[in-house]
Amino acid sequence: GGVRRSNERCFREVIGKLTTSLLYVNKDAFFDGNKIFLEDVNGCTICLSCGAASENTDPMVIIEVNKNGKTVTDKVDRERFWNVCRMLKLMSKHNIQQPDSLITEGGFLNLRGVNLANKNFQGEDLSEIDASNADFRETNLSNVNLVGANLCCANLHSVNLMGSNMTKANLTHADLTCANMSGVNLTAAILFGSDLTDTKLNGAKLDKIALTLAKSLTGADLTGSQHTPTPLPDYNDRTLFPHPIF
């Protein structure tokens, strides 16, 4: 028990120091060679740097842990590491509580089932998040990058999604009632079983989607929207999806 508590304290210390360091280093700078140093972590100094890709491997992040003149080195996948960094920055900036793992088994930012109601994510990069069953009620998601986001069964009632890019987003069984989706790019998004009752879709780009698979479009405003109906062949009434928890 004592060893476990010590490890947990060390882990929290690393996460805290890394989150603080990320205030001063962005993705481009880190990938271009800027290093991240975490000082005095249980008596160790940790150096994080981005290594170049080789012929047979993807780019990796090199982790060097130095203590008393001895250095231990390891490597992790670069994109997966940066997704952890993205998640830490989001959690810190928006006071998000995530007691589970930061990244899903598929490498997505893990926001599954998280309460995100009444938050302001305007202009954020939320691409490739897994927010299935998350609660976004009355949240500001305007001009947000939601490309490839998994919003399956999410509660998006009365959210502001104006101008957001939701290309290839999965909105299966999502509650989008009374949402403002004016000017949203929904190209190739999945709307199977989604509820678009009283949703504003004026000026939205609806190419390569099957609106007929939505649960309801009652009262939806489609004025000026661009719709090229190209249903995805692998989604039908027999496709298995998770069920909403709200």
Each language-model region and where it sits:
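Extended low-polarity, hydrophobic cluster-rich segments
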Residues: 14-19, 46-48, 63, 81-89, ...
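Tandem repeat scaffolds
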Residues: 82-87, 91-246
